[in-house]
Structure formats: structure tokens, C-alpha cells
Design a protein with these regions (language model features):
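Selective recognition of specific alpha-helical transmembrane segments in multi-pass small-molecule
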Residues: 26-34, 126-138, 217-233, 353-354, ...
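Alpha-helical transmembrane segments
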Residues: 169-185
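Cytoplasmic membrane-interface segments at the C-terminal ends of transmembrane helices
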Residues: 3-19, 97-124, 138-146, 185-217, ...
């Protein structure tokens, strides 16, 4: 009886290759737009005047891929708004990254080993279409709002003085395209580093055993923090009310807060400052620390958060337990031939890279101010400005100075993460060795087929 043939996919044709790349790009943008739209709707942005919601949605996606949005406008000849926002809504970013990775991998699902030329071709086509999409996105992320002054008398006086308040925004094209390209490359690199389904060229197959176990384990740590943060956010919405705005924070910035907690639990620090109103609820200890007196720079650390809420000390054992579990899992999925010191070093490097990326992703800068005849006025905040656009009675009342800055101290955070990773990797390897489960994995679990005796030494 004739045996059924097994389908083996070959390199895509030119048209199929471009369609595959288009599917990856469109899927990513669709996922980011859906999450951002729901989050903005919950935040109240659906009430923006002048049909500005689509442009604001495009601006949110611009920020999600690492771009920047500039605010501008003013009130005739007398006042001007000078502002800029550069902060990643990581819930939106994560949605796009996960969907793009899944679509990219599904196109390679019949591969055991992929040729280097084919993978580079797929990546190059995706990059080209991604850059085109980013350029179009920057065109859509611009809008100007004409803000009413209020009653008839205010309108009359404003017209006589030449006060025609307008507040607009536009995406910064160079940063959006440049950083957006880097964002895509990081997503694709992470996909190949984490997923066992991602085929590699034969020359790179030996290296996957050194990278994938640790990368996958730390990815699970980040996901665990998201689950914990989601549970805490939902509980807060139920107990303390304000459910709509709390859910908006979860849909826009859950990873920003959860992964910040991960870094703080490891001993990392962030420097920041907050003046004015945020507009959306954030954990009270974080907001209190950022509101340093006299506008001074604040330090976000385990100690400063615990000064506001003693429960913050739980971030330390939480980070220790999850990192130790990740070290065990990485060793459990590694080959028997990997020595303890090798596993510890690999896990230390992976931990350092993870915290480096978390630090870069959680940076935030949002500054604006209204000047009248060159002199800054007002004590409002960024939340007041946004609130006025969402229906406030007197928009000019909120056009004061406001800022939010958040920057990681990477020169201490990265070495700390490496030290934690070294310890967790070594202890994890010892625990895995006691289980007797480190070692052989069947060849079907690893792209590349059989190796000596039908088995290969473990896989990530």
C-alpha cells in the first residue's frame, strides 16, 4: 500500500512572499488598533470634538511602536502650546508583537529547517511593508482641535483679543519610522529566540540550545507579571470603583506598570517626576513617589515605594520566586551536557537583556506648557489639558505647565539583573539536576531532525 506523502513547504514565490509579509503587517496593526481603540474608548476619548478619534487612535499606535507625538497650538497671537509625548502604551505594543509573531510563525509551520536566504527574504519583505505602513500611519496621526471658550461673552471677548484656542498634534516621522523599524526587528528576534516552532538555518541550530531555554523561561516571567497585574487591576476596579478608567489603564499600560514592578523587585531604580494630573489612575505609591516636592527628581525604588505602602516589599520575594522558577525551567529544558556554570552564565545574560529591554520600554516623557507672550502660566497638568479636550468647561484653565518623566537607571539595573540571573540559574540547575529530568529530548521536538541515535540533547 502506498504511503501518504508528507507535505514539505518550499520557499514562497514572489507574489506569495509579499502576501505573507502583508498579512504579518496588517495583522499587527489590526491588533494594536483594536486594543488601543478599546482602551481609548474606556478613557473617554470617544468624546473628542471634530471627529478626532481616528487620529488619536493612530497617534496611540505611533507611540506603541516607539514613535513620538508632538502637541502644538495656542490661542491666537497671545498664547502657544509647546508639548511632546514619548511613552509606549505597552499593552498595545504587546498585542501587536504577539499577533505578528504568531502570523509569521504560521507561515513557517511546515518547516523543519529554513534556509538563511529564505528567512532573510521574508524579513526583508516584512520590513519594507512595515516601513510603508509606518509612513502612512504618521500621515494619519495628526489633528487640530478648535476648543470653545465657553459662553457668548467669552467667545466675544476671545474674538476681540484674537484668542482662537487650538490644540493639535502630529506624529514625529523620523522617530516613528526609525524606532518603529527597530521595534519590528526586536519583535522578530524575540520570536526566533523564544519559540521552539521557529525554524532556523542549519548553521544556527546548535545555538538554539544556548538561547531558547532561558529566553522562553524569562518570557514566562514577564507573562506571569502581566497575569498578576491584571488580577490586581480587576480587583481594584471591583473594590474601589472607577472601573472604566482602571480598565483603560489595563488596556493601555498594564505591562508598563507590571514590568516596572519586576525591575523594582530586583533592586533596579527609575528616576522620574510628575507635575499636574495624570488623568488615569495609577498605583498610589507610584504617584506619590513621583510627586516630589518643588518639582525635584524622584527615585522609584523598592525603598521609596515601601515608604508609601509597606506592601511594596512583597515585590522582592515575588521577583526572587519567579526568577528561581524560571531558572529551574530553563535548566529543565536544557541538555544534560550543559554544565552548571554554563547554565548560570546563560541565564544571567538572558536576565540582563530582559531588564535592559524592560527599562527601555518603560521610559516615558510627556511635557507641555502654555506660554502667554513668552511667559509660562498656569499650574494645571497634562491630564487637565486632555480633560478639557474631553469636555471641560474652560479649556484655557488647564493649559498650564505639566510633565511626566520616567527613566531607568540602566547602569545599575542591568548588572543587578545579571547577578540575580547568575544566582537563579545556578540554583535552578541544581534543582533540575535533582529531578533527574534534564537531558534527552526527542528529535521531533527540535527543528533539524535526528542527531546521532535518533535523539538530540534537549531543546528550548
Amino acid at each position: 500500500m502506498q504511503q501518504p506523502t508528507t507535505r514539505v513547504a518550499g520557499p514562497p514565490g514572489a507574489l506569495r512572499g509579499w502576501l505573507d509579509a502583508l498579512a504579518v503587517v496588517l495583522a499587527g496593526f489590526a491588533a494594536m488598533a483594536a486594543v488601543a481603540a478599546l482602551g481609548l474608548w474606556l478613557a473617554g476619548a470617544d468624546d473628542l470634538p471634530g471627529g478626532g478619534f481616528p487620529a488619536v487612535l493612530a497617534g496611540a499606535v505611533v507611540l506603541a511602536v516607539g514613535g513620538a507625538v508632538q502637541l502644538d497650538g495656542g490661542a491666537g497671537q497671545f498664547a502657544a502650546v509647546d508639548a511632546g509625548i514619548s511613552a509606549m502604551p505597552l499593552s498595545v505594543s504587546l498585542a501587536g508583537a504577539v499577533v505578528m509573531a504568531e502570523v509569521f510563525l504560521r507561515q513557517l509551520r511546515f518547516r523543519a529547517v529554513a534556509g538563511g536566504g529564505e528567512l532573510l527574504g521574508r524579513i526583508a519583505r516584512t520590513v519594507v511593508l512595515w516601513l510603508v505602513a509606518l509612513a502612512l500611519l504618521t500621515l494619519g496621526a495628526r489633528h487640530t482641535f478648535v476648543v470653545p471658550l465657553g459662553g457668548d461673552l467669552a467667545q466675544t471677548i476671545g474674538g476681540a483679543l484674537g484668542l482662537t484656542p487650538e490644540v493639535g498634534f502630529h506624529a514625529d516621522a523620523p522617530s516613528t519610522v526609525g524606532i518603529g523599524l527597530a521595534w519590528l526587528l526586536v519583535v522578530l528576534a524575540g520570536t526566533f529566540a523564544v519559540s521552539r516552532r521557529a525554524p532556523l538555518p542549519r548553521a544556527l541550530l546548535p545555538y538554539q540550545l544556548a538561547v531558547r531555554p532561558a529566553a522562553f523561561a524569562l518570557w514566562l516571567v514577564l507573562l506571569a507579571y502581566l497575569v498578576i497585574g491584571l488580577a490586581a487591576g480587576v480587583l481594584t476596579a471591583i473594590v474601589h470603583g472607577n472601573a472604566r478608567q482602571t480598565l483603560a489603564v489595563l488596556l493601555l499600560a498594564l505591562p508598563d506598570l507590571a514590568w516596572l514592578a519586576f525591575g523594582v523587585g530586583l533592586g533596579a531604580q527609575w528616576h522620574g517626576r510628575l507635575s499636574g494630573a495624570l488623568g488615569l489612575p495609577v498605583p498610589r505609591p507610584l504617584a506619590e513617589v513621583l510627586r516630589a516636592p518643588d518639582g525635584q527628581q524622584a527615585t522609584i525604588s523598592l525603598g521609596t515605594l515601601a515608604d508609601q505602602d509597606a506592601r511594596s516589599w512583597w515585590l522582592l520575594p515575588l521577583a526572587a520566586v519567579l526568577l528561581l522558577a524560571a531558572g529551574f525551567l530553563a535548566a529543565y529544558r536544557s541538555p544534560r551536557t550543559v554544565r552548571l556554570w554554563q547554565h548560570a552564565v546563560r541565564f544571567a545574560l538572558a536576565s540582563a537583556v530582559t531588564v535592559l529591554l524592560v527599562g527601555l520600554w518603560t521610559r516615558a516623557d510627556a511635557d507641555y506648557g502654555l506660554s502667554v507672550l513668552g511667559v509660562g502660566v498656569g499650574q494645571g497638568g497634562l491630564g487637565d489639558l486632555i480633560g478639557s479636550l474631553l469636555g471641560g468647561a474652560n479649556p484655557l484653565a488647564g493649559l498650564g505647565s505639566g510633565s511626566l518623566t520616567l527613566r531607568p537607571v540602566l547602569w545599575t539595573a542591568v548588572p543587578l539583573a545579571a547577578g540575580w540571573g547568575l544566582l537563579a540559574g545556578a540554583l535552578g540547575a541544581l534543582l533540575a539536576a535533582r529531578t533527574g529530568r534534564r537531558g534527552e529530548v526527542t528529535s521531533g521536538d527540535v527543528p533539524g531532525g535526528e542527531v546521532s541515535g535518533g535523539k538530540v540533547p534537549g531543546a528550548g
